[in-house]
Every structure is written in C-alpha cells, then in structure tokens.
C-alpha cells in the first residue's frame, strides 16, 4: 500500500514537472532569441523565473491535492474543480512552446489570457470546496496578469519578430 503522503507529493510535483518539460524551448536557441527582443524596463531578471514558477506550481499543486482529498478523490463532485484545474494547467504548459518554440508572441498572449480566465474559474470552483485551496491560486492569478502584460509589451515592441519569424541565430 502507498504511504499516505504520496498523493500530496504527487499532486504538488506534477505542475512543476509539466512546466519543466514544456519549457525545454526556453533553453538554447529560444533563450538566445528572447535575449535579443526589446523588453520593458520592469521585466524580471531571468534568474527569478525558476523560483517564482516553482513556488506557484507547488502552491497550485498542493491546492489541487486539497480539493481531491476533500471531494474523496476523482469523484463525480471533483469533475468541475479538477477539470478546470487540468484545463488551465494544459493552457499554462502550452505557453512556452508557443512563445519560445514557435515564436508566436500573439498566440502566446491569447493562451495567457485564456489561462487566466480558466485559472480564475478554477479559483471560484475551488472556493466552494476549500477557501484555503482557492487562496493558494491567488498569487498565480496575479502572476498571470503580470505575465500577460509583459507578453503584450514584448509582442507590441517587437513588430518585426511577430508570427514566428526566426531571425538568424
């Protein structure tokens, strides 16, 4: 039989693992390309992103565990709150390949806006089950708003690099 703490660890780690796997495009050529883009002065330093995302992913992952546990696992009651969560997580994981891999800054922005909407719906659904679990999503929602604003500014300020055009690297 699995130890009782295993589901909590699994739910907490899944978002980070997915985020890590979807961010492979950030490394190498994607990072080189991004370094050459015009960015606003308030752009966060690259080294801050891993700890920020690690914290956000861990909080949302543990929140999903709280919902799962409160609703008795993958029950019929859990379909909406965990389904919304899975949907926003899939949208979240789609952003790095869109932005860094395909270099589609506009579509990446659309993805971020959709992610924010589904994440907000997730927080509302979670609040009905566990206000604490919902509150674990609040920093993520704030970060998504910041990230969407940053994505928009980078997209707007790099007109010649829209549409996935790849400059010489």
Curated annotation (Swiss-Prot):
Its biological purpose: Promotes the transport of cholesterol across mitochondrial membranes and may play a role in lipid metabolism, but its precise physiological role is controversial. It is apparently not required for steroid hormone biosynthesis. Can bind protoporphyrin IX and may play a role in the transport of porphyrins and heme. Was initially identified as peripheral-type benzodiazepine receptor; can also bind isoquinoline carboxamides.
Family: Belongs to the TspO/BZRP family.
This protein's encoding gene: TSPO
UniProt subunit comment: Interacts with TSPOAP1. Interacts with MOST-1. May interact with STAR.
Topology Mitochondrial intermembrane: residue spans: 1-5, 68-79, 127-134
Subcellular location: Mitochondrion membrane
Keywords: Lipid transport, Membrane, Mitochondrion, Receptor, Transmembrane, Transmembrane helix, Transport
Tissue specificity statement from the Swiss-Prot or TrEMBL entry: Ubiquitous.
Origin superkingdom: Eukaryota
Membrane-topology annotation of the record: Multi-pass membrane protein
Gene3D superfamilies assigned to the protein according to its UniProt record, in alphabetical order: TspO/MBR protein
Stretches assigned to the Cytoplasmic side: 27-46, 101-105, 156-169
Transmembrane segments: 6-26, 47-67, 80-100, 106-126, 135-155
GO biological process entries: lipid transport
GO cellular component: membrane; mitochondrial membrane
Protein name (Swiss-Prot/TrEMBL): Translocator protein
Species classification: Eukaryota, Metazoa, Chordata, Craniata, Vertebrata
InterPro entries: TspO/MBR-related_sf, TspO_MBR
